[in-house]
Every structure is written in structure tokens, then in C-alpha cells.
């Protein structure tokens, strides 16, 4: 199925996510819709708190407890989520198990996941959180997928 990322029409999956956010169904349900749309195995939603740190609002099943404990609060500029917020740009890793860019923290490897992308959740020009998805296999997310995630992030920001 081709997705039109143009601003003139809204893809059906964005409308479904927008309805879920507007209905207050919760970040966990929104994350589930995102994972299905991106054919991803895992994901997280972090939002900036009053303390300036990113706070975990939703996480998919299967993330080890030790990792959840580590990512419950993330400093801006640390790890893929913190870097996406700091840079206001997607952070993409084909395989977090073998990545040598410095963008992937050692704790991320404990998930056993490989392909991963995290985008900033933007409210206007401000990054207010991070939306990340990952797969159990090597995968470089496309620019179109990154743009879709950024659009979803803008919907989350309105929630």
C-alpha cells in the first residue's frame, strides 16, 4: 500500500492514530498502532518532563525489565531518544547490536533488537519527546518511514 506523505491528504493510518490520541485511549494503544503500521517488534514513547528529562510514557511488551529501568528517565543528549530530541532529527541504526556510531548506548544492546529508529516528537519548532521503534532483524528505516513517524509524533504532541 502506498502512503501519501503530502500535506493535502491524510493517510488512513494517521487518522486512526489521531482518533486514538483524541479519544484519550492512552500512549500504550497509540504505540501499538505505530508498531503495527511500521511492522516493528518494539517501541517506546518518551515525553519531556518539567525537570527537562525524557520520561517513559509507553513501552511495548518484551523489553527486559533492566532496560525499562534504565530508560524510564533519559537525559536529553543521551542514547538514541535523547539524541533525537537534542538534534531534533531522527536517529537511525541498522543494527544496534553492532553499531559503532556512538549514538547507541550499551544498555540498548540488552534488548536483543537490531534495526531501530527514534524520531523527535515535535510541537512546532520544539522537541518535546521521542518516539522509537525497533525490529528483531537488521533494518534501516527509510526516509518515508522516518517522515511518517515524525507526523505521528506531531499527533502525539497534540495529545
Predicted regions and their residues:
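Amphipathic alpha-helical "output/dimerization" segments
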Residues: 123, 127, 141-159
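Signal-transmission linkers at sensory-effector interfaces
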Residues: 1-25, 36, 159
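Helix-loop-beta substructure at the N-terminus of cytosolic sensory domains
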Residues: 19-57, 67-68, 78
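Short beta-strand-to-loop transition segments that serve as allosteric relay/switch motifs
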Residues: 130-140
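Flexible loop/coil segments at beta-strand boundaries within sensory signal-transduction domains
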Residues: 51, 122-127, 136
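A short, aliphatic-rich beta-strand micro-motif
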Residues: 114-122
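Regulatory sensory and allosteric helical modules in signal-transduction proteins
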Residues: 48, 53-56, 65-99
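Signal-transducing coupling segments at domain and membrane junctions
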Residues: 63-67, 94-115, 135
Amino acid at each position: 500500500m502506498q502512503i501519501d506523505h503530502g500535506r493535502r491528504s491524510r493517510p488512513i493510518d494517521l487518522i486512526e492514530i489521531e482518533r486514538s490520541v483524541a479519544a484519550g485511549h492512552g500512549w500504550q494503544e497509540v504505540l501499538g498502532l505505530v508498531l503495527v503500521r511500521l511492522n516493528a517488534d518494539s517501541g517506546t514513547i518518551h515525553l519531556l518532563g518539567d525537570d527537562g528529562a525524557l520520561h517513559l510514557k509507553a513501552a511495548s511488551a518484551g523489553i527486559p525489565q533492566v532496560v525499562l529501568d534504565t530508560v524510564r528517565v533519559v537525559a536529553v543528549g543521551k542514547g538514541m531518544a535523547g539524541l533525537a530530541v537534542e538534534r531534533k532529527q531522527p536517529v537511525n541504526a541498522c543494527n544496534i547490536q553492532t553499531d559503532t556510531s556512538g549514538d547507541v548506548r550499551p544498555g540498548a544492546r540488552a534488548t536483543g533488537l537490531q534495526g531501530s529508529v527514534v524520531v523527535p516528537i515535535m510541537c512546532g519548532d520544539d522537541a518535546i519527546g521521542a518516539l522509537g521503534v525497533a525490529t528483531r532483524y537488521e533494518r534501516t528505516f527509510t526516509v518515508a518511514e522516518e517522515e511518517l513517524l515524525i507526523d505521528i509524533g506531531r499527533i502525539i504532541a497534540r495529545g
